[in-house]
Amino acid sequence: MNFIKKMTLTLIGATIIATNGIAQSVQHTTQGITYTTQEIDVKVEFYSPTIVRIYKTPIKKPYKKESLVIIKTPETTSVTFGEKGKNVTLSSNVIQVEVNPETGGIRFSDKEGKLLLTDKDYGTQFTPFDDAGVPSYNVRQAFLLDKDEVIYGLGQQQTGKVNQRNQKLFLRNQNMSICIPFIHSIKGYALYWDNYSPTTFLDNPQEMSFDSEVGD
């Protein structure tokens, strides 16, 4: 996943931090953190002061993602690390990221602390399946949006709607349907789901999610 304010979610000397009695191994990198939660390895990395990339893979199953879309080399970015209760925080001069190492939830806010988007607690799912003899995963990620938040994007859809809230769309390029798993919010952020396989986008009062057939 890429967070653009910007954000990407790719579904795919260390400091050990113990927060509120919950021993969580959170390793600091130059511009982010890595940690394991809910049997998932997670990497949070600032690509610039306005771009955060989130990379998730099943625990101890590393996968080198050679994205056809995310070709940018991370810029040198000053990142401040801290703690907020049991959570770990990291921020640039534009974006604040708050990670719950226990639930896997991630909150993205602007520099004033206004919440932009939430990567939902326990919201990541990897489901194993056999892809023509090759072990693979279905992958699903859920987010929380504001009730009245308007989002645009998802490519060239033939629904006659501009606001993509409260819809279920099957994202696969065909005929006049050109699908791009990218949304832009009126709150001033954008989200790119870095996966090329057929994907179901769903938004309802409970959550917004991307559910991809293959963890590409």
Question: What positions do the PLM features span?
Answer:
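N-terminal accessory segment at the very beginning of proteins
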Residues: 3, 21-216
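General helical structural elements
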Residues: 9-10, 57
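Bacterial N-terminal signal peptides that target proteins for export
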Residues: 1-9
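Bacterial N-terminal signal peptides
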Residues: 10-18
